[in-house]
């Protein structure tokens, strides 16, 4: 249509006699009607909108200047071509038309000419040209200044959610975050700008875009706030690193950790760093590296395989007692087994009444040519947690058939497990593509989950019967953002709170199930875990996080729990106060308050417990301790073991030492040990003796007289965990209450409390 309109206008100029009288009458005498029709038809005729998407963002910025420029060119040429005269018949009118965009007009009317006034088409062309110029100038200015405008918004002291590395396959995460984030939070996107469509959508959500190479300066702008006094404060509550290339994501995460190191976190807030690492083995290595560090922020890996596996296990009904059959060896299969192991650990947690539930684990059957290898993978993968917690049934099949598993193989398995859920976790494209549909038709009582190449996400309802066709998805159920393991632990803590604190007659928002719990309360639960994670180093607790679990877990003492409960309460108060809450005394039962008085308090942002720890009173202090102890019991679910912290001590005192000329047996607290020929026999002032290897003796004793040696050097020591076994060159030693574990140059040993007190001094 647009080309037809342009053709008619061109014929009117070049060969007006060829146009029918009816059409030519519409093109002259400055009639408004035809020109309005032309203006309305031309944009549509040119095909610019084309129904190809919403007219927002960068598309709109390109569309309307183009439409206005096309209108100006057509109407300008219509006005100038008949007036070319002695000038070049085409180039002169074209030059005059282009000059309209700069505000210049070639006058050919008046002074006795044939035309008494400017044609209406020319006036409209001038208006369209100037509008296009202005529109383009404003757009260029906004593009050039967008980075500066973004920096100005980042200067505001606001909490923010940061996304690093945006692409088309992670747009679902952006949409979910933008939909669920707190209204007072700021969304910040750091990206190199290669995917302009993704950045345009981020802009449509109001995100601050920091384009260009992702370096230390931009990371600091996005994640930190620098006060005038020079201190750096972490302002990012969540940081998603979503680079599609795994190594890029890991490198960016390390840069972020370096940026956050040394920055402070305001009381009551927590920062979570979530890194997209799709390979389960690399993700586990990432977590293990950070299982021994005490940081001001929480970190975890995100994976499309893990997020999908959680939903697959939920669909399978395994938690409800249904056996699980896993077919194939893949990243998804390994992630499914990891989720089964996690749910087993959760099921073994003590209930609210303190009773550990009986184990009712269902059968897990692995089917495929590499089923035994998958079982070994699962065992290795769960070593950080003390094992998988279940022994799978391995059904090794022949690799001769396509995909390694035939329908007959699965028929044999389902004969023994007729109610099992079958997860076809083979890589898409391997094996019979109709296996899922055949199983669903042959075994209508079985849930069948099939990983297929053309499927997207995990549907809530089956495709047909009990068949679910799934694809990988980073998002959680309901299109919510991906959940890290800290959020899952926070949900368990919330479930315990709901179980131990009966729901009042008029339920409050804080008693809602996790999926309906307001974000404010969800983040408070995560805050609690983050506070406890980073507070184990306070002097009253003096612990740190160990990687592999110790022989025995050191129970939390009442004094440690009380100290952590006080720290958690102070963090809770800071969190609530920063969100506008204030203290208001509760309504005692003697006043016969209305049943919904706590609901009314919540609406007014009043909290009776928003006061100092001392003012809280013994009863609330006790219950805070109960919730804190439960949260501490949850941390081992992520492989974290809190062991006493090591400190550096100086060796002091003088001993008598002689060289052994023959082996000598000796004992420490009833445990037999042995010194070999050539070892040193050391006796302290109290008369106690023990053997020392020559290399250790040379490094830790200095001769000061005949058979007299001064203890020198430093060691690292910590409180012993009762029952743990320490292996030294002299043999194995079982630690007791009050003992100390010492280590130096890779050698560890146990010292009694009295001997340690007399022979070591805390290094200054």
At which residue positions do the language-model features occur?
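Ordered core of a single globular domain
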Residues: 616-623, 628
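Structured core of small recognition/catalytic domains
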Residues: 378-396, 741-764
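Short loop/beta submotifs within extracellular cysteine-rich repeat domains
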Residues: 521, 536, 572-576, 580-581, ...
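C-terminal amphipathic alpha-helical interaction region
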Residues: 582-589, 621-622, 631, 635
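Cytosolic regulatory regions of ion transport systems
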Residues: 1-71, 82-92, 99, 106-566, ...
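Repeat-associated, polar segments at repeat-unit boundaries in modular proteins
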Residues: 529-544, 628-644, 697, 756
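A motif-centric signal for short, conserved binding hotspots located
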Residues: 645-685, 694-747, 754-756, 762-764
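Surface-exposed intrinsically disordered loops and tails
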Residues: 548, 582-616
């Amino acid at each position: 249509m647009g080309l037809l309109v342009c053709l008619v206008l061109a014929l009117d100029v070049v060969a007006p006699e060829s146009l029918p009288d009816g059409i030519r009458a519409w093109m002259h005498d400055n009639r408004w009607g035809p020109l309005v029709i032309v203006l309305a038809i031309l944009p549509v005729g040119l095909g610019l909108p084309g129904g190809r998407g919403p007219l927002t963002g960068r598309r709109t910025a390109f569309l309307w200047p183009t439409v206005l420029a096309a209108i100006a060119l057509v109407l300008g040429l219509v006005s100038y071509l008949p007036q070319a005269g002695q000038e070049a018949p085409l180039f002169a009118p074209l030059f005059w038309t282009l000059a309209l965009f700069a505000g210049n007009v070639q006058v050919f009317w008046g002074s006795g000419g044939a035309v008494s006034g400017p044609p209406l088409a020319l006036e409209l062309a001038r208006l369209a040209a100037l509008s296009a110029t202005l529109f383009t100038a404003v757009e260029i200015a906004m593009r050039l200044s967008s980075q500066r405008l973004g920096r100005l918004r980042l200067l505001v002291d606001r909490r923010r959610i940061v996304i690093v590395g945006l692409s088309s396959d992670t747009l679902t995460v952006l949409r979910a975050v933008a939909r669920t984030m707190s209204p007072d939070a700021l969304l910040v996107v750091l990206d190199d700008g290669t995917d302009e469509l993704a950045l345009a959508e981020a802009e449509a959500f109001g995100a601050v875009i920091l384009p260009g190479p992702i370096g230390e300066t931009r990371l600091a702008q996005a994640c930190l706030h620098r006060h005038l006094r020079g201190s750096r404060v972490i302002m990012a509550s969540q940081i998603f690193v979503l680079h599609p290339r795994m190594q890029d994501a890991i490198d960016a995460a390390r840069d972020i950790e370096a940026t956050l190191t040394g920055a402070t976190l305001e009381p009551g807030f927590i920062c979570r760093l979530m890194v997209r690492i799709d390979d389960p083995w690399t993700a586990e290595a990432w977590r293990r590296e950070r299982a021994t560090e005490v940081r001001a922020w929480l970190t975890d890996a995100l994976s499309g395989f893990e997020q999908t596996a959680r939903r697959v296990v939920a669909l399978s009904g395994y938690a409800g007692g249904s056996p699980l059959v896993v077919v194939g060896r893949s990243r998804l299969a390994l992630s499914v087994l990891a989720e089964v192991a996690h749910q087993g650990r959760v099921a073994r947690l003590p209930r609210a009444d303190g009773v550990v539930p009986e184990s009712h684990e269902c059968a897990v059957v692995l089917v495929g040519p590499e089923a035994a290898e998958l079982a070994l993978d699962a065992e290795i993968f769960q070593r950080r947690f003390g094992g998988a917690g279940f022994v799978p049934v391995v059904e090794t099949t022949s690799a001769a058939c396509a995909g390694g598993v035939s329908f007959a193989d699965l028929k044999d398995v389902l004969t023994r497990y007729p109610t099992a859920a079958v997860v076809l976790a083979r890589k898409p494209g391997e094996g019979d593509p109709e296996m899922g549909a055949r199983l669903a038709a042959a075994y209508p009582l079985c849930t069948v989950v099939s990983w297929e190449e053309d499927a997207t996400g995990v549907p809530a309802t089956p495709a047909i019967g009990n068949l679910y066709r799934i694809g990988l998805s980073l998002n959680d159920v309901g299109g919510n953002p991906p959940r890290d393991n800290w959020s899952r632990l926070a949900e368990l803590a919330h479930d315990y709170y709901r179980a131990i604190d009966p729901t009042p007659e008029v339920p409050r928002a804080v008693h809602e199930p996790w999926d309906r719990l307001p974000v404010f309360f969800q983040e408070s639960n995560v805050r609690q875990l983050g506070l406890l994670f980073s507070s184990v180093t306070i002097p009253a607790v003096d612990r740190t996080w160990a990687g592999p679990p110790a022989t025995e877990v050191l129970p939390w003492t009442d004094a440690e729990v009380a100290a952590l409960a006080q720290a958690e309460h102070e963090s809770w108060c800071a969190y609530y106060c920063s969100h506008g809450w204030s203290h208001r005394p509760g309504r005692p039962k003697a006043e016969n308050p209305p049943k919904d008085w706590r609901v009314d308090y919540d609406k007014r942002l009043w909290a009776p417990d928003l006061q100092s720890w001392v003012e809280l009173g013994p009863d609330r202090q006790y219950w805070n301790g109960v919730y804190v102890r439960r949260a501490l019991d949850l941390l081992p679910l992520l492989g974290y073991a809190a062991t006493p912290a090591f400190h550096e001590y100086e060796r002091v005192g003088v001993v008598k030492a002689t060289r052994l000329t023959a082996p000598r047996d000796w004992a420490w607290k009833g445990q037999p040990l042995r010194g070999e020929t050539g070892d040193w026999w050391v006796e302290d002032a109290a008369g106690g003796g023990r053997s020392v290897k020559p290399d250790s003796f040379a490094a830790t004793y200095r001769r000061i007289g005949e058979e007299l040696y001064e203890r020198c050097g430093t060691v690292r020591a910590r409180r012993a965990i009762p029952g743990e076994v320490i292996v030294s060159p002299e043999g194995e030693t079982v630690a007791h209450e009050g003992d100390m574990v010492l280590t130096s140059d890779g050698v560890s040993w146990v010292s009694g409390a009295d001997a340690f007190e007399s022979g070591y001094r805390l290094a200054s």
